[in-house]
Amino acid sequence: MGRESLAVVSSPPSATAPSTAVSATSLAPGFRFHPTDEELVSYYLKRKVLGKPVRFDAIGEVDIYKHEPWDLAVFSKLKTRDQEWYFFSALDKKYGNGARMNRATNKGYWKATGKDREIRRDIQLLGMKKTLVFHSGRAPDGLRTNWVMHEYRLVEYETETNGSLLQDAYVLCRVFHKNNIGPPSGNRYAPFMEEEWADGGGALIPGIDVRVRVEALPQANGNNQMDQEMHSASKDLININELPRDATPMDIEPNQQNHHESAFKPQESNNHSGYEEDEDTLKREHAEEDERPPSLCILNKEAPLPLLQYKRRRQNESNNNSSRNTQDHCSSTITTVDNTTTLISSSAAAATNTAISALLEFSLMGISDKKENQQKEETSPPSPIASPEEKVNDLQKEVHQMSVERETFKLEMMSAEAMISILQSRIDALRQENEELKKKNASGQAS
């Protein structure tokens, strides 16, 4: 949600109550401000240091080291019960010219832990990230708590205006509370409270409801008509989970029916024979239209995207069906091999079965491809009478094709020999196992 634009959407005011501004302080259920480290540094912190506005003002400014961590929630611009907050804070140097910062509060202090981590975009260094843990009391006898802060700062960056170094002017702090000491495995998201949203008030949600405007187009009769279908919110969209149905007269709007009828309505003429010819032409055209399949676009004028999704779904189903059909070519042979190797219980038998199936599929796919090519060649329309040069070229192509087929047959023969050798080895192994079982049975009966 870090890259999404956000807009304030409020419920329409009542007729009696005056219109009031909606406070953009709460996110709608399911939406959370959760930017990445790169977005926090390269967008929010950088624009704050340069004094540039941001599209979504979600981070408040507070002197974070003058307040206890459990008191910081009231300074957050996003009113949420989630145990995670974001703030801008100015650094307070412990000494005027030194590099050490004063991170002590009235009841404790923030202590850095581990090394600062680099935030990069590919090879470009954007900023640094410091992890701090709040300790209650005074150093070095402070007690570690479950309050953690990630402090983001920019690397040395010269502003575009005066060239002064302002990388230490502000830092961005992400404060959160863990359930226990250790990695943040606990759930920092607060449970949903239905009563908080019972009034249906304004909420901050991502995205803007953009409506497409359709310009008026000149019609054939010279009148400019605006298509009101794009602005109507009461019409039903197509359900992509249902198959398309045939168009009915109710699906065609009255203006379309009138236009359709006027397009085929014969003009009045004093000549009775001309009128009869026009009427016969009209009947033929209507008969041709009855034979045509019904148009599906009439049902989907307001839903081009679901129609595309439906087409994609049908295409995926056709691809799956074609893959199933390809696998069915060798189903009988694979079943025979599986029945032959039913008695094999070792891992070597499974590997051999896989190899046999692969060889069978390879050979049968090649044979099916050649059959399809032959069928296409047989069904191709006869070519016109060719010149002697073209006949010679055709003969050369046939000779080349025959040589290619001969090489293909050689490969198929080699694969068949390999399969025969594999099957023979398995037969020998089964015979040996059978003899061993017979010996064991004979020794068991003798004893």
UniProtKB/Swiss-Prot annotation:
Residues 392-447 form a coiled coil. Disulfide bonds: none annotated. Residues 1-21, 246-303, 371-392 are annotated as: Disordered. Keywords: Coiled coil, DNA-binding, Flowering, Nucleus, Repressor, Transcription, Transcription regulation. The keyword ATP-binding does not apply. Residues 27-178 form the NAC domain. GO terms for molecular function: sequence-specific DNA binding; transcription cis-regulatory region binding. GO terms for cellular component: nucleus. The keyword Ribonucleoprotein does not apply. Disruption phenotype: The double mutant nac050 nac052 exhibits early flowering and increased H3K4 methylation on specific genes, thus leading to their derepression. Impaired RNA-mediated gene silencing. Pfam families: NAM. GO terms for biological process: flower development; negative regulation of DNA-templated transcription; negative regulation of gene expression, epigenetic; negative regulation of transcription by RNA polymerase II; photoperiodism, flowering; regulation of gene silencing by regulatory ncRNA. It is found in: Nucleus. Mostly expressed in floral organs, and, at low levels, in other organs. Residues 126-184 bind DNA. Residues 281-293 have a biased composition (Basic and acidic residues). Interacts with JMJ14 and NAC052. Transcriptional repressor that binds to the motif 5'-(C/T)A(C/A)G-3' in the promoter of target genes. Also binds to the 5'-CTTGNNNNNCAAG-3' consensus sequence in chromatin. Can bind to the mitochondrial dysfunction motif (MDM) present in the upstream regions of mitochondrial dysfunction stimulon (MDS) genes involved in mitochondrial retrograde regulation (MRR). Together with NAC051/NAC052 and JMJ14, regulates gene expression and flowering time by associating with the histone demethylase JMJ14, probably by the promotion of RNA-mediated gene silencing. The NAC domain includes a DNA binding domain and a dimerization domain. This is NAC domain containing protein 50. The gene is NAC050.
